[in-house]
């Protein structure tokens, strides 16, 4: 173990900061010698108090305590939630009660919260007492404990009330860091890196050097069990002794910087605000992401953004930004809010641009409304001595990923520009490989600092190829190559992002590695696009040369696995080089290390031959000379040997990147010079100026080492008929945008510029040729693809360039940079402020080769830019497809049709598509001829194609049962699900499946038992799916239709078409505690009457297997007609049955609930935060209820525990909060209501248990848990039925008595009173429903509309139209139907007219097996008011055509005219018309009286319709609106003669009535008892 001494740091003229390791004795001695007092008060929080070292410190203090002194201890609850005025007051009350006086010394032992709050206590207690800081977190050690800032938080914001109060001493004992959790340790490193970054370049470099070892040690922290006074506890332990010197030094150096700055500016009037580097933007992020994101994590992101701002303003070099970003990442800190792990950690919270700017506007550094930010000049030095005012425009650009480019109109006022592009990516990557394989140190200057080279450097280190260090403040990389002798396999994959060059070069390097221990291979992988790019020809050549390489996913692309035991033999190697010259360069550079000399023979002329020449010339610089064969074309001889590194190697600027500023000059008529690229360049793209721009009318001056271009007047570039860009393929994109602006009336080529020799550009970061054609068309520029090139039609004048909605960049740096130029030529000549800018998406992709391109375009070339925030996609605008997976016979075909109909999607069966796409017969035929393996490969290719084409186009894609058999297809499924696509696993009972498959001759036979196939695939189905749905065996038509109805609602809910919302009105859910729901279905149907949801207590189930739980959930949906489910697992500590510490099973079950698409999921707030994080991140459409139960009665409603839990729930972004306490007296109900009234940020379910807590259940507003008389017992003490709640609520005035009426004449036989009164009685509502017979609407107005107790009116004939004149507003249905059957009184005295007849029709049909969206024709018999309601209902059910027949057609013609044209109503007059119809009719409604026989002509028409064949996916169904008798003549004819399903008008009556019931009362009517009451005579 390293040893460190004690260091004292001076601040404000005193050596009061003491830094060391294990300072217990020193602290005690110093405090008692220097701070003499009668009372010492040690304040810490509960987390710190349980650390053994805290007890050891207190013991040392007790031991050294002077004889006449005493020591008191006070422990507060941990966390920012308790950093309040209330907690401060409690500490002060304690000190007053203990008789503390002005000589008291307070010791704050803890993190920043304790230091801030206890310091504020010391500042105000007895008008100020002495205090000592003992910081226990890294953040507190280097930041909050230094400088004397003290404060508490308020509801208005953090640290709003406090003071400056300097501590007597700050004892920084780094031993505390041993028990600091890993994330907190890393969190503190942000402040450490910040101080080095702004003040101490040498320390910054030291931090860079030690990052790897630091993270290795901190990541190795482990949980240990320790005994404390409070009992055994678990703590994080990090063995910092391994890095003690480094940790001590980083703490000390950071403190020195802050102490120096504070001493110069104690009250933060100038210099001290430099310490806020990263904080202006970081604090804004923190305000939105707290508490999931820690302070240091947000400051880390803020530092990167503020460094990028400094670069954007031409103050900081790109190299310095890259260093800062790299070191932050190296210490485990986030550098962007979009990093995957950080987004997951922060629950995907959004950080809207305008909110960030608003948060920044309240920064204390600001100058009024002007935002001020600390800018960086270089690592170790700030720009100026205080923060600088920056514009919102510049901030917007830095904070967003979309660039807005304004016309380049104003740039011509500037003089010539000298631009030095970053180092060449091609040369940088080659130099790194050669230097790493070479022997000795090589200083590489002007290296490109980009994503590509970053991945290459990391890979070189990971393979132990070289030792890497930096000089010249990070501008020079020093590669100490090991000569190829130390290359060893890696146990971690080499992740290469989308770095194609690195992947190809490293594939050959990997063939040279040696195994070591368990490490016997190298895996190369990358991002999704990288895994599509080709590497096949290179791999094939390596394989033929003895290297064992496996593809781990798609054949021909990464990831690949290179086995270390195989050898790169050498000898003659044949290579196909028409796709990429990088294959050739890769083998060339590694060839000297083969076992024998290499002869590399290329199969024909290689693409981009100049890049091969570049490689050969560079190899010679490093000591290996390649000889070209004199006898064979494109053949090279490479001797064995070892590279000898030159002392220095200077990378040329990237010639491809240089084309952008040169093209800028060409387009704008300005002058640009590139000072380090000329005609002697290694790079083919150096010819761009002479070969492309000069013939187009530019003035070009090129020397051996520099290139200058001056453009003609804007709009006068001349077209170039043809250019072969094979030597400079990457520059073709720049040529395209210049060509788009070229025009000449004398041109022989008709302004069509042909570019060839660029076929390889189709397999770069994207298909660049197609990308250019597609994006140019958005500007109004015509372009066509050629087999090896592109043709671009230049516009006749710049004013013809159009403004595109947005430019897609395809995550391709060259696409983005090219179109940033053309964008500036749109509306050229107009003032930028008067024009709509061009939006360029994903602008940060330029970081691959030129991270500072936008900065150069803005600050050096003078372009006007702004930033734009991508708008979140509206779910309604996205038709994200649904993929169905599951075993054969799982119902994918049937359910697929249901799914497509419910969503209005198209259905695509992958097996049918296979036959069409490949033209090789059916799947069964193909398998018989070619075997399963060949089929699986083809299936994967097809599936990838289908997803690419249809994933956002509204398709239901039904796959074969074995789609999960291949890793490639599983990856496609997982990626689709990860981006929000629905992958739905359908399954049935496996025994039923086996039984069915044994009798199905249409499918290719399995070569193994079905159960074995299921056992193998089951885990894959779970892994790949985002949702699961269990389909039970249906033995009757009714069961089948019930399942269809349930599935339709399920699929619409999980896709967001039927959103699930937390109720905003009084609502309840019934609690089910059965061990098995299946035997209790009838009881459950009755138990849910009047409820908005049903809770299944999963902890009570007899079996926790996924299969059992999913079967229970489907059964519950079927029993309750898809009532929303509350999925609850209650642990024992929270009053349930589930084991408290079985977190793995609990999380698995919660995931089952989410994948089952439950509408609500109860998530206990006491569960470990990682479980919270994972569940919240995959909540999909499920609403989360954050719950906390106090069964022990430990906490009153005034206790801070509830405040803490409420803040926790808000921070977790749950959708509703549920708090359950235990009432000890009636007054607890009043305390609860006081709490409820103050906590309104989220919907709150808050109740007390026990008898004396019943009132709280009555007063609770939303989702009150209830029991039912039909259940065996209540789920919790004091639980009430819905009827009891309503009766009690009414008795205390919560529900006022109301009167409802049916009006019209005659109404003597009306069943409405019995319908509604049955519902009121069942639910305990204080309402009555009576008849009010009249044929005068005016009497209704005078007698009823003026009543204060009026709750609603049902209107029947003859008043449905007459009453409308007295109403204030009509619903859309009432307007369209032209009649009102429901009057709704509003609180403001207005009356709304509604029509529920159409709902009665629609819901009656749906209840009898008709889907919500029929997608077929409908038939209406009759022409009265009910016929109009039927027409409206049919339109809402998406009937394609509505046919109408009647005894007299004149009435129908008038009715047809009164409806909108989109209803597509057709009046049928004759039988001949019916015979000519081809469209099937699936639903019908009879609206003619049932007390008289049908007219013969009408009866014939009806029979003609009913006898036509029906091609619907459901039984054709007819409703007779007449409800007496139950079976009318029309229903008898339809069912008995023509096989239609009959639906009685009594159902329509009840359905329209329960719709009224819900509108008037807010409660769901109990359908079954209401229906029974209505239909019984």
From Swiss-Prot:
Region (Shikimate dehydrogenase) location: 1297-1577
Which reactions appear under catalytic activity for this entry? 7-phospho-2-dehydro-3-deoxy-D-arabino-heptonate = 3-dehydroquinate + phosphate; 3-dehydroquinate = 3-dehydroshikimate + H2O; shikimate + NADP(+) = 3-dehydroshikimate + NADPH + H(+); shikimate + ATP = 3-phosphoshikimate + ADP + H(+)
Which positions bind Zn(2+)? Answer: 191, 279, 295
Q: Does the keyword ATP-binding apply?
A: yes
The annotated pathway is: Metabolic intermediate biosynthesis; chorismate biosynthesis; chorismate from D-erythrose 4-phosphate and phosphoenolpyruvate: step 2/7; Metabolic intermediate biosynthesis; chorismate biosynthesis; chorismate from D-erythrose 4-phosphate and phosphoenolpyruvate: step 3/7; Metabolic intermediate biosynthesis; chorismate biosynthesis; chorismate from D-erythrose 4-phosphate and phosphoenolpyruvate: step 4/7; Metabolic intermediate biosynthesis; chorismate biosynthesis; chorismate from D-erythrose 4-phosphate and phosphoenolpyruvate: step 5/7
Sites binding 7-phospho-2-dehydro-3-deoxy-D-arabino-heptonate sit at: 127, 143, 149, 159, 191-194, 258, 272-276, 279, 295, 364
Region ranges (3-dehydroquinate synthase): 1-392
EC number, as in UniProt: 4.2.3.4, 2.5.1.19, 2.7.1.71, 4.2.1.10
Q: Which positions are catalytic residues?
A: 268 (proton acceptor), 283 (proton acceptor), 845 (for epsp synthase activity), 1189 (proton acceptor), 1218 (schiff-base intermediate with substrate)
Q: Residue ranges of region Shikimate kinase? A: 882-1071
Q: List every stretch annotated EPSP synthase.
A: 405-863
Q: Which UniProt keywords apply?
A: Amino-acid biosynthesis, Aromatic amino acid biosynthesis, ATP-binding, Cytoplasm, Kinase, Lyase, Metal-binding, Multifunctional enzyme, NADP, Nucleotide-binding, Oxidoreductase, Transferase, Zinc
UniProt family annotation: In the N-terminal section; belongs to the sugar phosphate cyclases superfamily. Dehydroquinate synthase family.
Q: How does it assemble?
A: Homodimer.
Q: Which named protein is this?
A: Pentafunctional AROM polypeptide
The organism of origin for this protein:
Eremothecium gossypii (strain ATCC 10895 / CBS 109.51 / FGSC 9923 / NRRL Y-1056)
Lineage, highest ranks first: Eukaryota, Fungi, Dikarya, Ascomycota, Saccharomycotina
């Amino acid at each position: 173990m390293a040893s460190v001494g004690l260091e004292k740091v001076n601040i404000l003229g005193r050596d009061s900061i003491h830094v060391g390791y294990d300072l217990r004795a020193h602290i005690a001695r110093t405090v008692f010698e220097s701070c003499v007092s009668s009372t010492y008060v040690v304040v810490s929080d509960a987390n710190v108090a349980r650390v053994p070292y805290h007890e050891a410190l207190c013991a040392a203090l007790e031991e050294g305590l002077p004889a006449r002194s005493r020591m008191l201890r006070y422990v507060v609850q941990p966390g920012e939630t308790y950093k309040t005025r209330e907690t401060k007051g409690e500490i002060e009350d304690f000190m007053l009660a203990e008789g503390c006086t002005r000589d008291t010394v307070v010791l704050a032992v803890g993190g920043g919260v304790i230091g801030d709050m206890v310091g504020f206590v010391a500042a105000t207690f007895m008008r100020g007492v002495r205090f000592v800081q003992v910081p226990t977190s890294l953040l507190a050690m280097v930041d909050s404990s230094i400088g004397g800032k003290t404060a508490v938080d308020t509801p208005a914001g953090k640290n709003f009330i406090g003071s400056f109060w300097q501590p007597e001493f700050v004892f920084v004992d780094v031993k505390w860091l041993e028990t600091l959790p890993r994330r907190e340790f890393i969190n503190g490193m942000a402040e450490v890196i910040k101080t080095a970054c702004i003040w101490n370049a040498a320390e910054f470099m030291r931090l860079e050097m030690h990052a790897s070892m630091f993270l290795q040690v901190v990541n190795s922290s482990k949980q240990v069990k320790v005994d404390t006074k409070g009992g055994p506890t678990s703590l994080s332990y990090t063995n910092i002794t391994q890095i003690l010197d480094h940790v001590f030094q980083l703490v000390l150096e950071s403190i020195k910087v802050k102490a120096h700055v504070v001493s110069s500016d104690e009250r933060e009037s100038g210099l001290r605000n430099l310490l806020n580097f990263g904080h202006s933007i970081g604090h804004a992020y923190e305000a939105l992401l707290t508490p999931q994101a820690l302070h240091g994590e947000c400051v880390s992101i803020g530092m990167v953004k503020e460094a990028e701002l400094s670069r954007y303003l031409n103050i900081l070099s790109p190299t310095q930004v890259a260093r800062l970003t790299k070191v932050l990442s190296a210490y485990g800190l986030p550098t962007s809010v979009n990093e995957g792990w950080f987004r997951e950690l922060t629950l995907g919270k959004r950080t809207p641009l305008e909110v960030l700017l608003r948060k920044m506007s309240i920064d204390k550094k600001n100058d009024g409304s002007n935002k001020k930010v600390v800018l960086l000049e270089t690592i170790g030095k700030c720009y100026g001595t205080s923060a600088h005012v920056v514009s919102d425009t510049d901030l917007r650009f830095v904070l967003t990923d979309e660039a807005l480019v304004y016309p380049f109109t104003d740039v011509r006022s500037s003089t010539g520009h000298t631009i030095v592009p970053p180092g060449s990516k091609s040369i940088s990557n080659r130099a790194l490989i050669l230097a790493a394989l070479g022997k000795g140190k090589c200083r590489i200057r002007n290296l490109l600092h980009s994503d590509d080279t970053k991945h290459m450097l990391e890979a070189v280190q990971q393979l132990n190829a070289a030792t890497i260090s930096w000089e010249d403040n990070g501008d020079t990389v020093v590669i100490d190559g090991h000569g190829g002798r130390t290359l060893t396999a890696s146990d971690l994959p080499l992740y290469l992002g989308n770095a194609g060059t690195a992947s190809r070069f490293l594939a050959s390097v990997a063939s040279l590695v040696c195994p070591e221990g368990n490490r016997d291979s190298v895996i190369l992988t990358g991002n999704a696009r990288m895994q599509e790019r080709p590497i096949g020809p290179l791999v094939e050549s390596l394989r033929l040369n003895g290297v064992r390489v496996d593809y781990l996913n798609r054949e021909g692309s990464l990831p690949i696995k290179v086995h270390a035991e195989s050898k790169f033999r050498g000898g003659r190697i044949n290579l196909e080089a028409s796709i990429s010259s990088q294959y050739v360069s890769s083998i060339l550079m590694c060839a000297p290390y083969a076992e024998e000399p290499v002869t590399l023979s290329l199969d024909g002329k290689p693409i981009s031959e100049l890049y091969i020449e570049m490689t050969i010339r560079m190899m010679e610089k490093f000591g290996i000379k390649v000889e070209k064969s004199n006898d064979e074309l494109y053949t090279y001889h490479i001797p064995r040997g070892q590279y000898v590194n030159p002392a220095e190697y200077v990378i040329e600027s990237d010639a491809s990147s240089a084309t952008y500023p040169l093209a800028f000059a060409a387009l704008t008529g300005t002058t640009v010079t590139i000072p380090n690229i000329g005609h002697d360049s290694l790079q083919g793209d150096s010819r761009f100026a002479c070969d492309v721009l000069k013939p187009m009318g530019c003035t070009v001056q090129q020397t051996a080492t520099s290139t200058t271009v001056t453009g003609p007047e804007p709009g006068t570039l001349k077209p170039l008929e043809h250019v072969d860009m094979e030597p400079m393929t990457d520059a073709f994109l720049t040529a395209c945008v210049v060509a788009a602006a070229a025009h000449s009336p004398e041109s022989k080529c008709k302004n069509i510029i042909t570019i060839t020799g660029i076929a390889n550009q189709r397999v770069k970061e994207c298909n660049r040729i197609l990308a250019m054609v597609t994006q140019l068309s958005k500007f109004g520029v015509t372009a066509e693809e050629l087999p090896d090139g592109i043709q671009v039609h230049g516009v006749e004048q710049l004013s013809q360039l159009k403004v595109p909605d947005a430019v897609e960049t395809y995550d391709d740096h060259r696409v983005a940079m090219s179109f940033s130029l053309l964008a500036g030529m749109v509306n050229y000549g107009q003032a930028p402020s008067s024009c709509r800018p061009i939006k360029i998406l994903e602008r940060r992709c330029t970081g691959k080769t030129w991270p500072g391109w936008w900065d150069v375009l803005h600050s050096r070339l003078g372009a006007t830019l702004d930033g734009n925030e991508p708008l979140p996609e509206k779910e309604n605008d996205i038709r994200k497809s649904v993929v169905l997976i599951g075993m054969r016979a799982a119902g994918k075909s049937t359910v697929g049709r249901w799914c497509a109909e419910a969503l209005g999607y198209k259905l695509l069966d992958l097996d049918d598509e296979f036959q069409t796409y490949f033209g090789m017969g059916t799947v069964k035929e193909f398998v018989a001829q070619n075997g399963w393996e060949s089929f699986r490969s083809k299936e994967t290719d097809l599936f990838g194609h289908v997803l690419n084409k249809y994933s956002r186009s509204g398709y239901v894609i039904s796959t074969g049962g074995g789609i999960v058999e291949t890793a490639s297809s599983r990856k496609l499924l997982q990626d689709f699900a990860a981006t929000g696509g629905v992958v739905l696993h359908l399954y049935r009972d496996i025994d039923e499946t086996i039984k069915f498959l044994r009798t199905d001759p249409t499918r290719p036979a399995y070569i193994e038992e079905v159960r074995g196939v299921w056992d193998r695939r089951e885990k894959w189905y779970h892994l790949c799916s985002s949702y699961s749905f269990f389909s039970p065996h249906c033995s009757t038509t009714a069961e089948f239709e019930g399942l269809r109805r349930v599935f339709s609602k399920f699929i619409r809910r999980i896709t967001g078409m039927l959103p699930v919302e937390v109720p905003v009105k009084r609502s309840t859910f019934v609690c089910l505690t059965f061990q098995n729901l299946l035997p209790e279905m009838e009881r459950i149907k009755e138990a849910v009457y009047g409820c908005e949801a049903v809770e299944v207590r999963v902890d009570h189930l007899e079996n926790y297997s996924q299969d059992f739980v999913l079967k229970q959930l489907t059964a519950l949906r079927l029993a309750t007609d898809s009532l929303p489910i509350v999925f609850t697992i209650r642990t024992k500590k929270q009053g349930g049955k589930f084991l408290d510490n079985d977190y793995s099973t609990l999380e698995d079950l919660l995931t089952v609930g989410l994948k089952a698409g439950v509408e609500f999921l109860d998530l206990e707030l006491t569960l470990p935060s990682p479980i919270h994080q994972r569940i919240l991140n995959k909540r999909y459409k499920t609403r989360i209820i954050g719950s906390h139960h106090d069964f022990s009665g430990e906490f009153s409603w005034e206790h801070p525990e509830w405040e803490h839990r409420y803040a926790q729930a808000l921070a977790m972004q749950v959708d509703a909060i549920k708090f359950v306490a235990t009432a000890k007296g009636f007054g607890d109900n009043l305390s609860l209501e006081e709490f409820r009234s103050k906590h309104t940020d989220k919907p709150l379910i808050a109740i007390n248990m026990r008898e004396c807590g019943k009132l709280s259940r009555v007063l609770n507003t939303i989702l009150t848990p209830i029991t039912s008389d039909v259940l065996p017992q209540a789920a919790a003490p004091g639980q009430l039925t819905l009827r009891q709640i309503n009766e009690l609520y009414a008795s205390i005035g919560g529900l006022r008595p109301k009167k409802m009426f049916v009006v019209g004449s005659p109404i003597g036989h009306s069943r409405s009173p019995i319908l509604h009164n049955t519902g009121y009685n069942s639910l305990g509502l204080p309402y009555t429903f009576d008849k009010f017979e009249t044929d005068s609407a005016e009497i209704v107005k005078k007698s009823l509309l003026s009543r204060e107790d009026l709750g609603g009116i049902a209107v029947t004939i003859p008043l449905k139209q007459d009453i409308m004149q007295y109403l204030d507003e009509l619903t859309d249905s009432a307007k369209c139907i032209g009649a009102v059957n429901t009057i709704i009184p509003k609180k403001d005295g207005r009356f709304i007219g509604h029509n529920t007849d159409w709902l009665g029709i629609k819901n009656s049909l749906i209840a009898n097996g008709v889907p919500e969206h029929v997608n077929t024709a409908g038939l209406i018999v009759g022409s009265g008011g009910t016929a109009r309601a039927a027409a409206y209902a049919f339109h809402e059910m998406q009937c394609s055509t509505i046919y109408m027949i009647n005894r007299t057609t004149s009435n129908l013609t008038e009715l047809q005219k009164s409806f909108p044209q989109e209803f597509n109503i057709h009046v049928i007059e004759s039988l001949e018309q019916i015979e000519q119809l081809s469209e099937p009719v699936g639903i019908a409604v009879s609206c003619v009286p049932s007390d008289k026989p049908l007219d013969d002509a009408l009866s014939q028409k009806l029979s003609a319709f009913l006898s036509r064949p029906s091609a619907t996916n459901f039984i054709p169904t007819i409703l007779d609106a007449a409800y007496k008798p139950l079976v009318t003549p029309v229903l008898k004819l339809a069912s008995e003669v023509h096989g239609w399903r009959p639906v009685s008008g009594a159902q329509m009556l009840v359905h329209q009535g329960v719709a009224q019931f819900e509108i008037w009362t807010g409660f769901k009517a109990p359908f079954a008892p209401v229906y029974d009451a209505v239909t019984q005579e």
